[in-house]
UniProtKB/Swiss-Prot annotation:
Organism taxonomic ancestry: Bacteria, Pseudomonadati, Pseudomonadota, Gammaproteobacteria, Cellvibrionales
Organism superkingdom: Bacteria
Pfam families linked: Hexapep_GlmU, NTP_transferase
Family: Belongs to the bacterial/plant glucose-1-phosphate adenylyltransferase family.
First-level EC class: transferase
Residues that coordinate or bind alpha-D-glucose 1-phosphate: Y109, G175, E190, K191, S208
PROSITE patterns in alphabetical order: ADP_GLC_PYROPHOSPH_1, ADP_GLC_PYROPHOSPH_2, ADP_GLC_PYROPHOSPH_3
Organism: Saccharophagus degradans (strain 2-40 / ATCC 43961 / DSM 17024)
Assembly: Homotetramer.
Name listed for the protein in its UniProt record: Glucose-1-phosphate adenylyltransferase
Keyword list, A-Z: ATP-binding, Carbohydrate metabolism, Glycogen biosynthesis, Glycogen metabolism, Nucleotide-binding, Nucleotidyltransferase, Transferase
GO biological process, one term: glycogen biosynthetic process
Pathway entry: Glycan biosynthesis; glycogen biosynthesis
């Protein structure tokens, strides 16, 4: 039974350092991550994916945070510096960026475990009791104090946060585990094509969320052993966890909604389809992810922008948005927006029609353009009269990417415009 005392949990979180793994590209997002790491990708109208684990840390009372970066990290680093640099150093609080810097070898980060190992001296200087390793590219709201308390109460060497997901979703994408009646992990497979089915929930498997709580000295010992193994891929899911479950106590912490005890909201958004779907969920009347929860806010950096503006109300042109999220700085000037997300500084010109689409910051859609079921990357300028998402063969012929589920991706390069990596965003 977990101790519900808030001071007890607060003491545990103060004794914890969080390390956010934020160096991945997210290759299944294709051109959307050509110029940015996946954790830097915009999400939910005004946020970036990295804001979710960072906000979870802050809301949980964890104020010592390291962010490990590698792949095309400029926009991620810029966002963290602008939005997450106000911690009180005098109180021992910080968010530090830990780029691959070849501290222990001539190589860059070779895997998730190696990324932590290469910062071992920094962690030793901090001397926390517990280390919380987090994936930086998932969308969810989670109290990390609960999993740390679970870890301590069970006496585990390692605790893995997990969630029930459909087998077809987990196949080839997530690490999956088998547990006994005490939630001790007895088997762990990294991204198997045929995940083990849950006995009490047909069609589902128990998937790793990529979040781990370690006793600090235990983690250090395992990292040193792994670094000395020439056959290791230096990955938690592939090497560390499978190698220790037979001899050490590795516990599974099931992530559930505290109010309903059902499986909590968690999205990987690792494909274009899942990214589009997760954003589209937010425009529904009662989405599973509550961004309006004042008890668990998602913090972020945002520029000072004026309110969204809707202009023109003539019979022939009317600027409006319905069942949509429209961010600051947007102007809908005589255009129609339905079931869509407009990120900051988007401009929709007269007679343009946007439906079931995600428009990232600084997109401009000129007169009479029509966009349906699409993702438009940052700073794209959609020419007058262009039609996107209505004819997939035509989209493909112009070099746009169309997913299996019929979502069209458009980037600046596809439009023959200046690459996103050198634009304002």
């Amino acid at each position: 039974m977990l101790d519900p005392n808030s001071r007890y949990v607060s003491r545990l979180t103060r004794d914890t350092v969080a390390l956010v793994l934020a160096g991945g590209r997210g290759s299944r997002l294709h051109e959307l991550t050509d110029w940015r790491a996946k954790p830097a990708l915009h999400f939910g109208g005004k946020f970036r994916i990295i804001d979710f684990p960072l906000s979870n840390c802050v809301n949980s009372g964890i104020r010592r945070i390291g962010i490990l970066t590698q792949y095309k990290a400029h926009s991620l680093i810029r966002h963290v510096i602008r939005g997450w640099s106000s911690f009180k150093k005098e109180f021992g609080e910080y968010v530090e960026i830990l780029p691959a810097s070849q501290r222990y070898s001539p190589n860059w980060y070779q895997g998730t475990a190696d990324a932590i190992y290469q910062n071992l001296d920094i962690l030793q200087a901090e001397a926390p009791k517990y280390i919380l390793v987090l994936s930086g590219d998932h969308v969810y709201q989670m109290d990390y104090g609960a999993i740390i308390a679970h870890h301590v109460e069970t006496g585990a060497d390692l605790t893995v946060s997990c969630i029930e997901v459909p087998i077809e979703e987990a196949a080839g994408s997530f690490g999956v585990m088998t547990v006994d009646d005490d939630n001790r992990i007895i088997r762990f497979d990294e991204k198997p094509q045929r995940p083990t089915e849950l006995a009490n929930k047909p069609g589902y498997t128990l998937a790793s969320m990529g979040n781990y709580v370690f006793n600090t000295e235990f983690l250090f010992d395992q990292l040193r052993k792994d670094a000395a193994d020439p056959d290791s891929e230096h990955d938690f899911g592939k090497n560390i966890i499978p190698n220790i479950i037979a001899e050490k106590l590795v516990s599974a912490y099931r992530f559930r909604d505290h109010d309903t005890n059902e499986t909590a909201y968690w999205r990987d958004v690792g494909t274009l389809d899942s990214f589009w779907e997760a954003n589209m969920e937010l425009v529904s009347p009662n989405p599973s992810l509550n961004l309006y929860n004042h008890d668990w806010p998602i913090w972020t950096y945002q520029t000072q922008l004026p309110p969204a503006k809707f202009v023109f109300d003539d019979d022939s042109r009317r600027g409006y948005a319905v069942d949509s999220m429209v961010s600051g700085g947007c102007i809908v000037s005589g255009g129609k927006v339905k079931s869509s997300l407009l990120f900051s500084d988007v401009h929709i010109h007269s007679y343009a029609e946007i439906e079931e689409s995600v428009l990232l910051p600084e997109v401009e859609v000129h007169r009479s353009a029509k966009i349906k079921k699409a993702i438009i990357d940052s700073a794209c300028v959609i020419p007058e009269g262009m039609i996107i998402g209505h004819d997939h063969e035509h989209d493909k012929a112009r070099g746009f990417r169309v997913t299996k589920k019929g979502v069209t991706l458009v980037t600046r390069e596809m439009l023959g415009q200046q690459p996103a990596g050198t634009s304002a965003k």
